UniProtKB/Swiss-Prot annotation:
Keyword Transport (UniProt): yes
Class of this enzyme: oxidoreductase
Gene3D superfamilies (alphabetical): 2.40.40.20, 3.30.200.210, 3.40.50.740, Dimethylsulfoxide Reductase, domain 2
Domain 4Fe-4S Mo/W bis-MGD-type: 41-97
Highest taxon of source: Bacteria
Protein name stated in the entry: Periplasmic nitrate reductase
Xref: PANTHER family: PERIPLASMIC NITRATE REDUCTASE, RESPIRATORY NITRATE REDUCTASE
UniProt binding sites for [4Fe-4S] cluster: C48, C51, C55, C83
Record note on cofactor: Binds 1 [4Fe-4S] cluster. Binds 1 molybdenum-bis(molybdopterin guanine dinucleotide) (Mo-bis-MGD) cofactor per subunit.
Cofactor(s) listed: [4Fe-4S] cluster; Mo-bis(molybdopterin guanine dinucleotide)
GO cellular component: membrane; nitrate reductase complex; periplasmic space
GO molecular function: 4 iron, 4 sulfur cluster binding; electron transfer activity; iron ion binding; molybdenum ion binding; molybdopterin cofactor binding; nitrate reductase (cytochrome) activity
Subcellular location: Periplasm
Organism: Aliivibrio fischeri (strain ATCC 700601 / ES114)
Amino acid sequence: MKMTRRAFVKANAAASAAAVAGVTLPASATNLIVSSDQTKIKWDKAPCRFCGTGCSVLVGTQNGRVVATQGDPEAPVNKGLNCIKGYFLSKIMYGKDRVQTPMLRMKDGQYNKDGDFAPVSWDVALDTMAEKWKAALKKHGPTGVGMFGSGQWTVMEGYAAVKLMKAGFRSNNIDPNARHCMASAVGAFMRTFGIDEPMGCYDDFENADSFVLWGSNMAEMHPVLWTRISDRRLSHPHVKVNVLSTYYHRSFELADKGYIFEPQSDLAIANFIANYIIQNNAVNWDFVNKHTNFKQATTDIGYGLRDDDPLQMEAANPNSGAMSSISFEEYKKSVAPYTAQKASEMSGVSEEDLITLAKQYADPKTKVMSLWTMGMNQHTRGVWMNSLVYNIHLLTGKIATPGNSPFSLTGQPSACGTAREVGTFSHRLPADMVVANPKHRAISEKIWKLPEGTLNGKPGAHAVVQDRMLKDGKINAYWVMCNNNMQAGPNINTERLPGYRNPENFIVCSDPYPTATAQAADLILPTAMWVEKEGAYGNAERRTQAWYQQVQAKGEAKSDLWQIMEFSKRFKVEEVWGEELVAKAPEYRGKTMYDILFKNGQVDAFPLSEAQELNDDAKAQGFYVQKGLFEEYASFGRGHGHDLAPYDTYHTVRGLRWPVVDGKETLWRFKEGSDPYAKKGSDWDFYGKPDGKALIISAPYEAPPEVPNDEFDMWLCTGRVLEHWHTGTMTRRVPELYKAVPDALCYIHPADAKKRNLRRGDEVLISNKRGEVRVRVETRGRNRPPEGLVFVPFFDARILINKLILDATDPLSKQTDFKKCPVKITKIA
């Protein structure tokens, strides 16, 4: 090969730079340098694929492959920063075991539940699925099919799934994995404010005087937001950081005060703070009188277990979300027992420390930002706990103004934008509407051009009940998309795996990798990831962000959206609706679900010419499907406090926080002058409630369903670590992240280790009546539990720690408590 002098100089310069950086260039690197077309990296924006922070990244592509990512300096969320996971986004799609063709369990050339996985065509895969779905619908009706989706679905994927299940199959048995992470937050938002999602935004980080973390390790789980807290704390000496947790973690390193409390006693701490505010005349009476009402929650509501479970049978008011009106004096009386002494006895936190925390809320000059994630939400009284923190902010009027913000952080990139806003929960419809409300069903049927009575008014099976119905043979056809519930969910051995392997059931898993869930399924569908498709996410501060497809998917992988739409083509309306309903819309006779749901003159309203050249989903359908779905979905919220901008706008900005009215985003909701829906002269307007008033809800401490005993004498808490995300499906396939933290460990207090004759690195058996796992002990490091508690992260597929978790839920939100269950620790010889 001949080289020009200029090319030679460039090649040597590149080699020199590589040598300085300690990198060895391949021999063919000079070829890349000679060809300017090949060396040119194309950059475009996209929201990060990981957590709910919503960082924007710049994605570099070359020769049809993502080769680099970097923090987006124009992004207001992360301002050019990435966390360690974000820096390796370019590698998440290129794991060696990427599934690239549909895989069906086969024996002797036919589907067989006990067969081995074998590659099949998409037509065979989808035709087999359709056959199983039709059989389940014929046997059980709409309740015989189910879908478990994701807070990682794009907005369009989730919306298409809702239409397919709720309008097409007329089944409300669709739920997202956000049920495991955000359902308690949703429940409390709806009870307290009548509308979902935070009233504040990330600008609060630069305005608060005090930060209080209630069960959130932001240093590892939301590290980019943690940098904003760190900057505020280190730049302003008066700012205080408070961290409450059941064990010591990295967020404590910045904290001015750390509070280690007994599991479940956060209920007592929050009630104490409310009592302290009242007893010390710190109630903002002007705010309380104008903008709040008082309610009493129904108590002794059980734990969301099966109806025949003894714990559930003991409850006086199982699963009741009823509330009764009370006066302020009655509320005052309800929190009066929670004195500093009582709360200290219950929590293990000193009276002095409890008062230190309460004073920050009570001081009218201190702007307080409360933050929480799974520690509060994954809780058998998670809705109550969320509400108790809202009570504190409402009593003091510290809400919906810069720096005063009770803020529920999300764990997935579109738990807000897709699971919550789109309404992929079993009881919801888009824009905070619910299936149980006839008016909401009528609105949805009108927008979707469905005959009256199409939508089912009974909420469907939520995540935990879906497992039980599969086990009991009541759901026979089930589709898992964009999650790994066989590793992430609770009580795997007893309630989940039996349903997957039930001979009556057909389980489909759409995933890019052979996860634990995929391996337990009957059909694996290879899925396009992240920038292999066009989409949109919604983050924790109500910011909607969109991105274009930037590379093509590996092999035969297809997006979840393509899969949903192609599947819908295999059902004629007569096969799923029944004659009575079809008779109301005779023009639909002979049409497919695809024709009715996605070729309805709205979803297909935008021509292919409007889409980018690289848009495989649009090309497959022959129209700009992402824009059509988004605009139809957005029509639910416009004019109703959930306004989204036109779809094309999101491709020109780094996201906008809804409601977006007249092109302007909203930073603080409910506050006059900031929120366009707040009435003039109202000052604050909680317009989700008919009278514009938020609720202060009294709820007591109630014990968890299980506590340690003589046999199972330790608490187990499960969660995450910085380097891995959820079940590690993506991060464990990034070599640098895998090498950094290859294995899950059992973090244990040195005194507990000594009692059991354990040393760091010893292998132990963690067990209870639901199962056992083998894991190595860690007595040092980032996580330091108190005596009596161990922490084990759940990213490691070889250590299915969540099999030990009881499938008890908050009866109101149906969210599982992954933060506390009794276990015993035994040394393995």
